[in-house]
């Protein structure tokens, strides 16, 4: 069974392990989430829980949103996400999910929206190599060949310049270094996707490396 929680990325810092090792960590503020809905194989074809995170002003919500959260006896939520294959039987609608669901040493996957980089060329966007910069070369940072002559067109999927970033990215197999239950904080080893204050979803790892 998978467990998960929604939170906001605060930023990065570093902590010391007991053996003196310096560990870079990302701080995630995961205030209590509320279970808004339970989905089961019988009713929906799969098992999942729907979590709501951060209160939203009622003025900014529509009637369906208000009715949906009212069933869980809570206020409208700004962010709503599903955690698939969760422990449906162990949770009830309206119940709070806190950082205590995780413990130090657990391995998790963290999903977020990557930082937007704007319009970028193929070298930065796709990691292509540049051409010679001197000796009469006129090919420096271009995308290269557009493909064979015969099709008379450029195939879909050709790696070209374009808008970079702003994509959903999941970093797998990150270790939880510390869980601060008093301040609702998770300290995760390494970096996670997204800018500061952006939404992240922390879930139990799907592919735990042995």
Curated annotation (Swiss-Prot):
It comes from the Bacteria. One of its GO terms (molecular function) is rRNA binding. Coiled coil: none annotated. PROSITE patterns: RIBOSOMAL_L3 (PS00474). Residues 125-151 are annotated as: Disordered. GO terms for biological process: translation. Keywords: Ribonucleoprotein, Ribosomal protein, RNA-binding, rRNA-binding. GO terms for cellular component: cytosolic large ribosomal subunit. Belongs to the universal ribosomal protein uL3 family. One of the primary rRNA binding proteins, it binds directly near the 3'-end of the 23S rRNA, where it nucleates assembly of the 50S subunit. Part of the 50S ribosomal subunit. Forms a cluster with proteins L14 and L19. This is Large ribosomal subunit protein uL3.
